[in-house]
Structures are given as C-alpha cells and as structure tokens.
Amino acid sequence: MKEATELNEDMLEEAEHLALLEPEDDGTFFQVTNLLNIMDSESAKTDTTGPGLDMRKTLASVIITEKATTDPCVVMNALIRCLQMPEISTQRKMNIYNIMQEIIQQEGEMEEHCIQRLVAIASKQMRDITEAEDFETAEVASETLVALSRNHFSLVMYELQHHLKPLNLTDEFVIVTLAKLANGNVFEFMPYMGITLATIFTMLRLANEAKMRQVICSAMETFCETVQFYLRHLEDSLYPVMTEDQFAVKLFPMYRYFVTVWLRHQDLEVKLGVIKSLRPMLSLLLPNDDLREQVYDYIPLLLAEFQGTGHWPLFPSLLQVLRQILEASVTTNTPIPPMLLHPIFTELHVQVCSKAPAQQQFSSQNLMEIVHCFIALARSYPKELMKFFFSQVEMSKEAVRVGTLALIRAVVSADDPKINIKTIYLAIRVVKNTLSDTRSKVRMAILRIIGQLVLSGFQEKIKGWGLKYVSVQLTLSTYKLTNRRECFYQRDLEEKMVHKVTMDTVKIITSSISGMTNEFWVRLLCYIMETDYTEALTPICISLTNLAENQIHGKDTEAGIAGKSKHVDLPAPQKLLARLLVLMSSPYKGEGRGIAMLNLLRTLSQSIAPSMADMWEQEIPLLVQYLEEHTEFTWNQKTWEDMLIQFLRNSLKKTRGTSWSLRLSKELNNQIETFDSPSLEKGFLYRALGFTLGMGLEADRVEVLLLELLYKTDYSNDFDREGVILCFGLCARGQVKTVLNVLQDFEERIQESEQSWQIGAWRKDHPWRRETVKSALMVMYSCVSSYCHPQMLLTHVDSPITSKIIHHYSSSCQDISLKMAFMKSVVQVTNAIKSIQDPEDFQFAHKSALTGLIVVIIKAEPPDHLVSPVRSMAMDALSQLSTMKPFYSPEESTELMDISIHTVISLQPPGEDNESVKTLYANTMSSLKQLMEGLLQRQLDPKGLQDTVHLLEKWILSEKEWEREKAMALHLHLMQIYVQSIGVCIPLKLGQFGVLVGLIAPCTCDAHRRTRLASINVLSSLLDLHVSQTCSLWGTSKEQELQKCKEDLQDTDMNKISSASSRVAKVVCPEFNCDEVVSLIQKLCENIGAMDLQHDRAAVTWIGIFLQMRVKELEDKVAEILGAILVHLPVVDHPEVRRHLIEGILLLAHYHQETVLTSLLRQPLPMESHLTEVWLAVAENVPFARTMLHGLLGRLQSRFTAKINATSKADIWRLAAVDPLMTLCTIQLLMEKMDQDDKFPDLFPDLLYTFLLQLGSSHGPEAASPVLKTWRLVHTGPLPQEMTLQRCSRSRITIKSMQLLVKRINREPLEQALEEQSVWSLLENGGTFLEGVSLMARLCMQNMENYMQRLAELVLTGMGSEILSCCISSTAICVEFMSDPVLHQEKLLRPVVLMLEKGAGQDKDETLQVLSLRALGNMALGAPRKVKQYRKLLLEKCLGSLQGQVSSSAMAEGMEALTKVLAELREGDIGSSFEAISKQCRAFFDNESELLRLKAFVLFGKLTKVVGISKKHFFKGEVKRGWVSLLLHCQDPCPSVAQACVATMFQCVHFWGWKSLESSFGHSNDSINEQMTVFQTNMCSVLAQKKPAVLCGFLLETTVFMKNNLSRIRIAACNLAGIIMKQLSAHYLKKMDLVGLRNSLQDLQLDSDAGVRRAALETLKVLDSCNQHWLLASPRGLP
C-alpha cells in the first residue's frame, strides 16, 4: 500500500513537471518555432542533396543559442514547450536537445523550476523507447542530462536515483547515464557509488536480455575505472573517504556473478562485455590478499572460455585477464595453486601450438600476451614449466615442438634476473632432446635458440653441441638446396629459410665467440670449395677472412697455428684461385660476394702464389674499388669480366715458364661441371679456360685438354655449346693449328660420316644428337676464323673452315638450331674476311653455294608469324655475302630482295606485352633494311630503283596496315639511300616519277600515322630528286607549304589529314609534265580498291586535282587517262569514289568531248553499271547532256552519210567507228534520265529519223522486197545467231528510245495512235518494219506538223545515202510523204522524185525498187497536179517495172503505181505508152501470182476508163484477146482477183457493143457462178448468132485453159466449153477438133479434183449430146 502511494506521488509529481507550460512570451515561442521549422526543412534537404545546404540549419541554431545568452529562461521554456508539442518528429527532438546542450554550456542562469521540468522531460523521453528512432532521442536526452549535471548534479542524480530501485530492473539509458555521470563527475558521484553498485547487483538476476547485460557490463567497467581514478586522487576528494578494500568487497560479488553466470552466456557480445569489465575489477580485487585467492578459484572458468567454438574474438581480452592474474601472483609472491598450473600450461601451450583456422590465428600482440604469461610462469615455476616443456617435446608433432622451442627461446631472451642459470640449463636439456629432428621448422627453432643463447651471453653453453649442430645444418641445408626438385617447391622454400637462419647463426657466432676450433675453420673453407649453393658465400668469406687474419697474426691460439707465418692451411692453390675467380665473375650475388672474395684472396695471396702476391696487392684494391663504385644495377658485366681476365693475364705472366698455367687450366676445366647452365660464372669459366689454354706452351697437352672438353660437353645445352665454341675461338688466337687439328681429330674419332654417327657411346648421361654436334662444329670453325690471326685466316678460310661449315649443314636435318648456327657461321666468316686490311682481291669461292642454302632457309620460314631469329640471321648473312667478291648480278639481287621482303613484311606485328617478340621483330626489320640497302647500292640507277619499288608495291597496297607501314618505312629508307647516293647523276625515266608518286600518294591519308609520315617523306625525297634532275623552279614557298602539310598529317582528325593531302597534290602538280600526269593517274587508278576507303578517297582526290589543274594541256593524253579510269571504274565499290572518278571523266568530256565520247562508246556491251553511272552524271547537267546527245546523234547519223576526211584530232575521234548499239543504249539512258521538262523540240525530228534508220539497219539490208499489202521482208537466208540477237537487242533498244521520245514530247494523240495501231510491234518485227515505218510517218504527219520540214529534209538526205538500209528506210518514209502535200509545199518534190527515179530504176535491191515505185505512185495522192508534169518519168519507171527480169513485187507495185497515175492522166497524156501498158497488163491475166493477176485486172479496168477514140480500136482487140481469160478468171480461186476480174470484164463489155449484156450480171439473187453461167450463155448465144467464128475461136482458147494449174480455172474452162458447144451450130462444130477436145476432157477424168472431174464429165455429156444431135440431123449413111 505504501509502495502504491509512493508510486502515485511520483506520477503526480512527474505530471506536474510535464504539464504544458503557459506561454510567457509568445513572440519568442513563435520565433523559436520558425527557426526550428527551418532546421527541419534544411535537414530534409541535406538528406537528399548532401551537406552543402546545412548552412541555414546551423544559422538557425546559432540564432536560438545567441538569443538564449540574453534570456535563457525564456528561450529554454520555449524549447521545452516545443519539446512537449504533440506528434513532434524525432529530428526536431534531436535539434531541440542539441540546442539545449549548447545553451546549458553557456553557463547562463536559469530558474530551478525550468531545470526541473527539463530534467523530468529528458528523463521521461530517455526512458520511453518504443521504436528504433527513440534510441536516438534517448541518447541525446541522456547527453542533455549529463550536460545539466555539470551545474545541477543533485537534480539530475536525484532523478536518476529515483528510477534506480532495488530488485527492479530499470531502463538501460538510466544505467548508461549513471555511467556517464560517474565518468564526468568522479568526486560528486562517489557518495552514490556504493548504493549504485548495490542496487545494480540486485538487478543482475533480472537482466535476461543480452542488450541489458552489455549495458551493465559497460557501466561496471566505467564505475571501476572511476573508482581507480578516485583512489589515485584521494587527496583531492572532499567527500567521505572510501577505502580500496571497501570497494573490493562491494565488487567481488559482482565479479563472481559475472564469471559464474554471465560469462557462460551464449551471446559473444555479452561474453566480450563481461571479459572487458573483468580487467578493471581485477585491478581492485587482486591487491586484496583475501580476495586474491578467491579470484584464483575462478581461473578454470576463464580457461574454459579458450575451448569454446567461435570464441576467438574473446581471446585477446581473456589473455590480458589471465596475464593480469599471473603477473599479480609474481609481484605479490602469492603462488597459484599447483593444481591449476598444468591446466594453465596446457591451455596456453595449446593456443601457441595448435593450427587454428585462419580467422582465429593470433596477432603478434596476442602471441606476446601468451609469451608474457609463460615468462611470468617461468619466474615462479621454472622447474614445473621446463618439465612441462620436456613432456611436450617428447611428442612427435612438429607444431608442438616448434611452439615449445619458440617459448623456450622467449624465456631465454627475457632480460629478467629472476630467470637464473638453472632455468637456462633446464631449457638446454629440453633443446638437446630435439636435435635429431630433421623437420625444417624444428631445425630453424633450434638454430634460433642457439643464436639467442649467444646473444644472451651464454656462449660457453654452445661450444660443443651448438657449433657442431650449426656446422651440420650448414652442410645439410646446402646439400638439399643444390639437389632440390621442382615438384617440392614448398620444401625448397622451407630449406631456404633453414639455410638463412643457419647463416644468421654463423654470423652471430663468428662475431661473438672469441675463439674458434680448427675443425670449424676447415668446415667453412671446404664449404667455399665444394658447395654448389653460393648464396651464403659472402658471410662465409668474411668470416674466413677474419679468421685467416687472426691466424696470420697469431691471435687465435686455439687454432694451433704458430702465429709468425703468413701461410695458412689451404687446398691446392690453383683450385682455390680457379674457384674464387669464377665466383667473382658474379660479384653482386649473395650480398656482394665479390668484395668479400677479393679480400679473402688478398689475405691468402702468400699462401696461394707468392710470386703473384705483390701484383695482387696492387690490382685487387682496384677491383674492389670498381665494385664499391657500382651496384648490381650499374655495373657492366663485360667490363668486369675484362678486368678479371686482365687480372688473370697479369697473374699468369708472373708464372711464365712454369706449369702453373696448365694446372690452372686443369682446375678451370674441372670446375665446369660444378656450375649450372646458364650462369655468369660458367660463361666466365669458358672464357678464362680458352684464354688460359691459348697461353699454354705445350701444344700436345693443350690438345688433350681441348679434346677432353669436346667429349664432356653437353651439346644439347645451348649455353655449354656456346661456351665451348668461345673457348675454342679464344684458344685459336694463339693455337689455331692446334685447334683445327683437335676438331679434325674429334670428327675422326666420333666417326663422323653420313652412314655412321655414333656419338652417344661417349655420353651416357647426355646422349648427343647429331644435329647439335654439327651445329657446334660449324660455329666452332667460324669462331676460329674470327679469332685467328688474319694471315692464318686466308690460308684456312676456304678449306677447311668454309667447306666444313657447308658439309656439316648440308648433311644435317637442318632444324632451327642448325640454321641459326649455319648463318651465324657465315656471318662470322665473312666478317673475319672483311676485317683483313689487305685481302689481295680475295675471291670467296663458296659464296654461291652459301647463298643458295640461305635462300632455301628463308623460303622455308612460316609466312605469317615470327618464331625464331632465322629470318634476321639469314638476311644478315646475305648482307655480308653481298659485299664479298664475286658480286651478285642484278637479277640475283632482285630475287634476293623479293624473297626477303615477302618473308618479313607479311609478318604480323607483335603484341604490346611480348617484349621478346617485339625485339625479334625489330631486329628482323633492321636486317631487311640493311640487306635492301646493300643490294640497292649495287644497282644505283632508275631501273634498279623501279625494280625495288615494284617489289614493295603489293605490300604498300596491302589491306593490312602493318604491312603498309613496314613497306612504306622500307621504301623511305631505300629512297633516302638512293637520293643520297645518286643525286643528279642519272635522271629518272619518262613517266617513272609519276608512277612512283602515284604509288605512295594515297598513303598520305593512311589511318596509321607512321605510314602517312613515311609516305610524305618518300614524296619529299622524290621531289628533291626530280627537282634536282629537271632544274625545276621549286621555290621556298612550296617547300614551306609542303612542310606545313607534313605537320598537318600528324593530326588524328581525318578531315584535316585529307585536306593536307589535297594541298600536297596542289603543291606538287606543277612539277609534272603531261606524260608524268598520265602515269600518275594510271597508277592511282590501278591502285584503287587495293586498300581501304580512305586511300581510295585520297587517290581520286589527287586525280581530280591533277585533272582540274592540267586538263587543258592533256589533249593528246585524254584517251590514255580515260582508258585508265574506265578500266578500273568497274571494280570501284564505294559510291563516293566512283562519283569522283566520274566527275573526272565529265571534266575531260567538257574540254575534249569527241575523244571522251568515242572512248565511252567503244566500251563493250552490255553497258556496265559504271558506264551507266557516267551517263547518269551526264544527264544531271542538262546543257551538257544536250551537247552530248547531239554528239551521239552525229555518231549514229555518220553511219549513213558519206565518209569525210579528218582535218583535226577531234575529227579523228569523231569519225572513229563505234558500236551503234552502244550509242543507242546511251541515247536511251540520257533521254530517260534527263530533266523531264526538256521536250527536245529541236532534236525530235533528228532523233526520230535516226532511230528509224537504226531500226532499218538492224533488220538488215539483205531483206527481199516486200509483198504487197503485207510489208514483210523475206530474207534470202538465215542470219547468224549472234547477229540475230544483236539486231533484236538493237531493235528493242531503238524502239524503247522512240517510245521515250514520243512520251517526252507529250503528244497524247500520237502516243495513243501508235499504241492502238501496234506500230511498235510492227517496227520491232523485221517482216513488218516497213509497214511500221509507213504508219509512223503517217501518224507523225497527222500529229506533228511542225516537224515535217526537218523530217522531210532528213529523208531526202537519207535517200541519197550509200547505205542500202538507210535508203530503204528513207524511201519508206517518203512513200507516206509522197501521199501528202508536204513535199510539194516544202519545194522538195523534185529532188525526191529524182531520188525515187533512181531507186525505181536500180535492180540491186527489190525492196528499194518496190518502195520507190510506190512512192512515185503516191504522187497522184499527194501532188496530183504534178503527175502530168512528171508523167514521162512516172510512165517510164512504172512500165519499166513490167518488163525485163523484174521481181513479181516490183511488177505488182509498178501496175499499182500505173493505176494511181492513170487516174490523173488522159489518153493523150499517155501517148504510145498506152499500147505497151495494155499489152503488159493483159500478159499478167493468167499469171500464177494472185497479186499480179489482181493488179493486172485492176490496171486493165483503169485502162478502159482512160482509152479514147484513137486507141479504142486497139484496145478493143486487146479486150478480144483477153476475153476468155476474163471470162474464166471471174471464177478465180482468189476472191479479190475474181471480183476485180468481174468488174473489169463488165467495163469491157461495151467494147463488144452488147448493151443487152451489160445489165445481165449482178441483178439477181443467184450465186456468182450461176450468174456467170447465165451471162456466158447469153454471150455465146449472141456470138453464135452474130459472130460464130469468134465463138469457135473462144472454144479453142478454152480448150487450152483445161490444162491450167488452177482447178477452178479448169472447171470454168470445162463449163465454158460446154456452153459454147451448146450454142454453136453443127456446121461450126464439125470444123472443130472434137477428137482433141474429147481427149482433153477424158484426161480431166483423171484429175485429182472431184469438181474438175464432174465438170469434165458434164462437158463430155454435152459433147456426146452434140454428136448424137449431129447424127440425127445428118442424112443416113453420112457420118
């Protein structure tokens, strides 16, 4: 009940403090609110845009703070009021609290009531945590309370203590704030410390959440640190004093609870918090004697934490706690219970020795904590600890032993007086127990302990076992390192570490121990002589030098040396000198062993060779000085080796006359197998050996050593092989004959031949390969030539040296190594020959053979990649051979150039990351340049230059940029050499300059910068050469402009590059003559398409510039230029490039039209796309296109005109023969593509007429005359197929062109009429062509009156042409013109008639004759009034066509023409021609030709109308003579003939005077045959009465027609005969040959036609009837 009352009071008090304040100053409140709003808005902006906008927020905060300086209470109340506003954001709360903290720090006076309200509000918001954001509010509220505590501690502490109640788990921020108060107000907090700790202790059982436990642990850590601070500053405290023991007593229960309960919590964060709080607790607990032992009791619980899974983050803090306890036990001399020692030993030892996972491994700091723990244990419990260590090393685990030895080393190294000698003794016992362990880490640990013992002052403890162990390890590690295997890399690394530790130990020992045993001296000296592992030689040499100096000066009595002598015990002097010389060849290995060895050599000089001692005293310091002045990065190997060789030479001079040098040679020879290959030491060894052998005086013993060296060399090892070769070369300097004898002897001994090669018998470890030995022998011979005396060289160079080289190469498999050896040998031999100052005109006999072999080698190399230096070496060899006599011929030089260029330039460039290939690549290119230069020097003339450039051309034009770059670089190099060498001596050939420039001009726009620069430099060189040879006015301004262009070509912008290239073209153009321009353009055209688009653009740009600048001067060269362009235009793919070339053609055509036109028209058909593009470009320019169209028309018309003689070059081209089909195609294309608004008013007649002529010519002049009314031309024989196809194609193109022409003039009636009447089909067909011409002419006359005059003029001209087809076509047109008044109106009738007269009078062509006759006849239609004027001519030509050997077509046309003409004449106009016409006409009545019969009957009918009185009697006789024919042909099988015959017959009836018969035909409905029967019956009746004799004559004529070819005529004849016999009297019948008539009729009974047989039978019946009638009428007895 009491607690409830207190709770209610607290709530009422809190509610009172939290009640909303009444506003004291609304202005301040609103101002503060506005400023807080600004801060909130700026905070939102800052979250999204960054801290750049935080200025306004800070300014608002500063304004509120500044206002609080004058009136803090008002501002604070306003802030408190804002803090109490509902739904306030967390950010605003934080801003308010931060401002409050700043106001509180100002130390202004505030009312206590205000402070109380602030404390209450902050305390409440600090404790009200419901969401994650509330933690931030609680934190700033806590900070505000801490800030208030500085001036109002009691109020704040009262509030916090008010909420800290026993057995009641408070809020976490209450404890956090209490910890902060304790840390910030130590002395003020101390009175509350006891009660605070006691209250918190009561909460421990209630704190089940991990977070709360962490807070309490952190608070306890702070509280303990505060107590320690308080205890250290007790004198400054004003509060009641609380002793350390009192604090310890209060803390221990919490310590116990933490260790026993909370430390076992599963949360690692809780564990870590507990352990961190233990250290400050132990600082207060361990000084207390009573509590210390109780702390010891809880050590097992701490040790247990080392065994937890995943507890590795706790280990650092745990180790610190354990170390704190152990060190306290040492300082207080309070031993830990013995039962706890072994667990502590074990747990700590395990942490050192176990192989924990990577994330659990200790840092060096943690390891030091453990070491300090063991040191503390060693101080108090040395015997127990060493006993534990001994038990651990008894185990075989490497990690355990290494860890244990490391801990022993730490104990030994501890500088602590409490660790006595007994402890060291015990430790050494433990170490000795591990000496037999061979594992690397154990050995290193033991060596480190030995070194540490020396460093710690226990040298005497290692003199026995320690030195021996070090010596053994030095030997053992060296052996293992020199015999290591590649598959045991890890083991080798460990062994290296062992060796390093061993060397460090040796260094420590030799620098720390005053005395040394003789055994150790011997071991170290033998180590230098025998070891193959040379990395440790430097410290060993230094140690030996120090020891030797001690021995020499008698300072080391233990060594057993007298001390007065300067000699020490050494192996063989030559052996030691050889060893040290070889090792000194790499002076900076092993930390600078060279200086150490030189000092050792100087120290031992008296012992090695007393005769050399004085010289060594002078020269060794110089060698040392050189090494000291340089480093491993600055020294020069060759210089150093030369210094050593000179040192050796000077040393050997001191022993001249003795066998010292020979013994040294043997030792050097023995040393060869002790070094690896390759190595600097072994290389120097071969050099020293060769030099030493060369100085030997006993040739036989030198031969033995050389032969031994040859046998034991591993020739498969490149380094050894080269070393032996160098050795033999150096030896040959003084022993050339000996060396050659040895080589020959070696070859004989190994039985060197093509059938037997048994070398492997001497080398079982490294079986020799035949090729490797052969390559070595080749280079040995060449090396001998390089080093031997010049006079001896000329004696031996051909034989045996060169001959042996060729033999060994030719008899081998010729792999890469052999090839390289062979070419190396060739170079060495040639260099050796060239080095002779006076070769006495030496002729190298084997030059040709060597060249052939090298060429084969080059050709065998892969073409696209570089795999070896074979190419480079081969070209170097050829370069050297080219200088030898006899020199190469020009053909041989060209062939060598071509082979070399091809094998190098085709190579792909190396990658950027492959330096070795890049070097190989550069060397190969350099060798090629050198070879090309050498060969070019032998042919320095234009031909040689052109041949060389020709070889480079295909590479300069390559699509691969690396090939272009290399080729251009080589071109530049050779061009510079040529210009420098030849100058103005020999001018270039005509056109050569243009070819050379045309080749490289496009490369000025190459995408690769180096190629562009090389090309412009080549161009500059060519210009320099050209200007110097032609004395051209090449000025400074041009040179400057060219230089600017070069600079611009280095740009990366392709537009600038193209512009620069164009400027270059303009600069150089004036330097070209016309021939050079042609050659340039030809070369540029030839190379278009060979590279990329940029090059093609550059090429056409250059062409355009040259044509623009020089076109007027190129009249004689147009055909060549145009030909070059047209030849290459088809292969140009890119439209832009094609357009530029076409523009060049148009430019040429503008100035030289005839030449260009002829060249274009002479291109073959079908028209290619490139030609189409040219003409399309022409069509775009209408004026120019019309000009070209005129020219094309002229070309077509010239075929039909008389030939004229050319008076100019333009005439020659204009009159040149061209393909008319090509011309037609071109005209059609232009008409189709030209501007549609151009109607061709001036060209229409010419075009139309020309097209018609072309059609006529395409159908051929071989056609026969047309058949009347069909216009079909009948060819006399089949045309060849090719000609037929061409003519058909020409016809179609011509017709299409005519259609385009008609469509363009926009005359729809004409166009429609042509389509409706199928004129185009008629024109296309050769058989109907003339009919189509007539229709075309007729329609044009009807629709195109304006053009008739011009067309008539053209027709007149064409009729006079010598070309038959032209005459025929023109005459066909004239046929229509003659039927129209146009000719008469244009006063062209007379010349036309004269032309027609000529055509009608000729007999060579039937068609022309027919058309001429037709045209003459049409005069009656077009100019009827002129017929009388030309009647004589007309009658003559028409009548002439009816006489003589004339075709039926001409006869028919003649009769038709007469029919037309007679219509306009009278009898008097005809004159005597009437009789001839009548007779000729009647003669065709019975003609086989229907056409002729038709025309004859029509003409005869026309004559009946013309005949007058004077000719009537004559014509009556003609009618009588032709009457039977008329009667019979009225039944002609041809209807038109029968009709014409009937009409003519009735026109002739009136000449008989039979008016009654004129109207007897055609007035009944009977058939024609029936009407004719009636007519004939009536006629015969009349004649029988009036003129029976005439009727008898008709019967006789009728009998003749019974044999006519026409069946209808035979029928008609039978019928007419029957009619006549019926009408004749018996008197007249008796006079007739009736027997003959009967026979004829009987013969007709066998006729194939049934109608004839019936008609004959009927007539026979009539005949029999007549006979019977005659018999009855006659008297009896009379016949």
Curated annotation (Swiss-Prot):
Keywords: Repeat
InterPro entries for this protein: ARM-like, ARM-type_fold, HEAT_Maestro, HEAT_MROH2B-like, Maestro-like_HEAT, Maestro_heat-like_prot, MROH2B-like_N_HEAT
HEAT repeats: from-to residues: 68-91, 92-128, 190-229, 293-313, 314-350, 380-417, 422-459, 571-610, 614-654, 737-774, 848-887, 991-1028, 1219-1261, 1387-1425, 1632-1669
Transferase keyword on record: no
UniProt keyword Transmembrane helix, yes or no: no
Pfam families in UniProt: HEAT_Maestro, HEAT_Maestro_2, HEAT_MROH2B_1st, HEAT_MROH2B_C
Transmembrane spans: none
Domain of life of the organism encoding this protein: Eukaryota
SUPFAM superfamilies: ARM repeat
Protein name as annotated: Maestro heat-like repeat-containing protein family member 2A
Organism: Mus musculus
Origin organism lineage: Eukaryota, Metazoa, Chordata, Craniata, Vertebrata
Name of the coding gene: Mroh2a
